[in-house]
């Protein structure tokens, strides 16, 4: 007996099919997994959490908050932006960053109630 397999074939085909057709395709699942992977890096997770608390912050503030160099923070923000988890806008000489709705949802899934919405 294997604890990971059923001993009997008792497929509930209609229920299993209804679940199967509602799932994302392998490509969509891969894209979602890649976005989720963005928060596997502690620096990116701290930056996202700071944006979750501060709504909109510049690179200088994020570097100070995270105790990381500005160029490293910029690198991580570019990665988060390329995966549509943060957005940016220029305000004079500053570039301001904020979480997208998708980024906020993913951050909430990772950190739970620790994120202020």
Where are the regions that the model predicts?
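N-terminal leader segment of winged-helix/HTH proteins
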Residues: 1-39, 117
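N-terminal helix-turn-helix DNA-binding core of bacterial DNA-binding proteins
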Residues: 26-69, 95-102
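Short, charged, intrinsically disordered terminal tails
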Residues: 108-117
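Short, charged/polar, Gly/Pro-enriched secondary-structure boundary elements
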Residues: 102-108
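Beta-hairpin "wing" of winged helix-turn-helix
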Residues: 81-91, 98
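Short, hydrophobic-biased segments on the C-terminal half of alpha helices
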Residues: 77-78
């Amino acid at each position: 007996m294997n604890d990971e397999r059923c001993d009997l074939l008792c497929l509930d085909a209609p229920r299993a099919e209804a679940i199967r057709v509602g799932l994302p395709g392998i490509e969509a699942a891969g894209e979602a997994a890649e976005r989720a992977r963005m928060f596997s890096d502690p620096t990116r997770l701290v930056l996202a959490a700071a944006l979750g608390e501060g709504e909109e912050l510049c690179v200088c503030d994020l570097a100070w908050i995270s105790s990381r160099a500005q160029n490293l923070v910029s690198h991580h923000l570019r990665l988060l932006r390329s995966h549509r988890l943060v957005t940016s806008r220029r305000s004079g000489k500053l570039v301001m960053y904020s979480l997208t709705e998708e980024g906020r949802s993913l951050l909430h899934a990772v950190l739970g109630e620790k994120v202020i919405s």
